[in-house]
Amino acid sequence: MFRFDKEQIVLDIAGTKIGGQPGEYPTVLAGTIFYGGHSIIEDEKAGVFDKDKAEALIKTQEEMSDVTGNPHIVQTFGQTPEAIVKYLEFVGDITDAPFFIDSTSGEARIAGAEYASEVGLEDRAIYNSVNMAADESELEALKNTKLSASIVLGFNPMDPTVEGKIGIWEDGAGTIDKGLLEMAADCGIDKYLMDVAVTPLGQGAGVAVRTSFAVKSKWGYPVGSGIHNVPSAWDWLREYKKEHKEAWPVCDVGSNLIQQMAGGDFVLYGPIENARMAFPACAMADIFISEAAKDIGTEAVEDHPFFKLL
């Protein structure tokens, strides 16, 4: 195990601590709810859903967080402005945990950010994300909200190397006019969750994971990813699982451990239904990391899985 010379920044988002030296704080886990095709949704555009089933899923994630000591975030996805506002209203009432405001639509993301600001949920809200594709209207609208936390996505298709990812955060790498960190700061963001933007196997997945070391060495900011998307894009596994279904969850949940072992502070582990698999697996990795880091001067916090599960 390793310890960074750079002082590590620990964010406090509504009482949830994200960051620190490997082995110090437990990995924060985020499960996605209301994603495209989610069975609990009755109308994706209008945001009509089964509230009992949604509550049960969030409470299960909450329960697993209590059991293992790994804090949780509710990754709240919405296809439209109308839908995401309804989802956030529900999530805000049903749990005290932080939540991601997530959508493929910039208009929906902003609607979510504005809603969170209007009703006093801004301290729990994390924007997903400030990235190279964000246009001026979205950034200006984000600036006018009260949000202070955001994922900053290190995706650089022009240069998917470690240097290219660092560059897109730092100065735009010649692809955009300014670095993503400066763009985020201009929007009032001062709590950066650095997403290394993991791409498919053979197309930079390993490089993205290695970027985790670079981020924490250079800035000390919390780092993580939605690394579970890698198995989803693996053609061989998609074919193999047709006859061997048991292989899929092993790779899906297991991918998160790779991000953890590279110094990751948070993982977006995929569908919230996977909470009962993801939390024990990630807690186990945290125990390994904490035990290994103890000999080099890193002490785990009191509610770490190392103390809760041993």
From Swiss-Prot:
Example of a GO MF term: tetrahydromethanopterin S-methyltransferase activity
Pathway where this protein functions: One-carbon metabolism; methanogenesis from CO(2); methyl-coenzyme M from 5,10-methylene-5,6,7,8-tetrahydromethanopterin: step 2/2
Gene: mtrH
Key words of the record: Methanogenesis, Methyltransferase, One-carbon metabolism, Transferase, Translocase
Catalytic activity: 5-methyl-5,6,7,8-tetrahydromethanopterin + coenzyme M + 2 Na(+)(in) = 5,6,7,8-tetrahydromethanopterin + methyl-coenzyme M + 2 Na(+)(out)
Full protein name: Tetrahydromethanopterin S-methyltransferase subunit H
Top-level taxon of origin: Archaea
Keyword Nucleus found: no
Quaternary state and interactors: The complex is composed of 8 subunits; MtrA, MtrB, MtrC, MtrD, MtrE, MtrF, MtrG and MtrH.
Enzyme Commission code(s) on record: 7.2.1.4
GO terms, biological process: methanogenesis, from carbon dioxide; methylation; one-carbon metabolic process
Pfam families membership: MtrH
InterPro entries attached to this UniProt entry: Dihydropteroate_synth-like_sf (IPR011005), MeTrfase_MtrH/MtxH (IPR023467), MtrH (IPR028342)
Recorded GO CC terms: methyltransferase complex
Gene3D superfamilies in UniProt: Dihydropteroate synthase-like
Induction comment: The last gene of the probable mtrEDCBAFGH operon.
Function statement: Part of a complex that catalyzes the formation of methyl-coenzyme M and tetrahydromethanopterin from coenzyme M and methyl-tetrahydromethanopterin. This is an energy-conserving, sodium-ion translocating step. MtrH catalyzes the transfer of the methyl group from methyl-tetrahydromethanopterin to the corrinoid prosthetic group of MtrA.
First-tier enzyme category under EC: translocase
Family, as annotated: Belongs to the MtrH family.
